């Protein structure tokens, strides 16, 4: 029994979240795939990551949500009640009751805001919070160590990304409602796959929710291209001779046209440094109605 426990512990110790080292001339980037929400089971992070932060010239994240001064939320024309059919309205009512959320308030909110509210409340009920997300945790750690925190894009850009979707975010809202029953299992497996660095499972997760080509282009493809251009530019915010820790959502680092591939095309030599294990969970594609 003791041998089994020791063997299991040793095997588990090998598993860690996905991270890479990218080098080009005198610039070294340690790139970690993040999950934007989390819980204490995701910590401590691998010592290679905390050491990379401690010895870095800066932490680069998607955006520093602590810098919210001057952020403007546009006036949306459509409410949630405007965009849902009768069946979807009933589904929203049932979901809001199960989460203890005010249905009328959700119905009068823009679709994107309703979707975000439902997702955050559901994650909170499952024990996950954005304050425990990997990027937020590392940003706070960087600040206490007097390490610069560098944003790839301003917070206003991310707000606009959410609020200026077609029909004020109807597609995102409908997906949130239809996938609500699976979220508990899916999020659990996502966190387990992230902790294990299970690339195959994370790719399966990315294929679970089929975004429209427009959303995929806006949320993933265009941003990956923009980030690769910035990280490889001589006139952006990075020193040409420096070490940086880059932390972006894991979905930006897997699949077609990911940031790793784009950096390689920009002349970076990239090596995966993390040791992975298969996660003990399964994603299943939801049946299409």
Locate predicted features:
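Positively charged n-region of N-terminal signal peptides that target proteins for export
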Residues: 1-2, 246
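Cleavable N-terminal signal peptides
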Residues: 2-3, 13
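A cross-kingdom marker for long, charged
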Residues: 217-289
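Short secondary-structure boundary/capping elements
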Residues: 14, 41, 223-227
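Structured, acidic catalytic/metal-binding patches in enzyme active sites
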Residues: 16-19, 23-30, 35-219
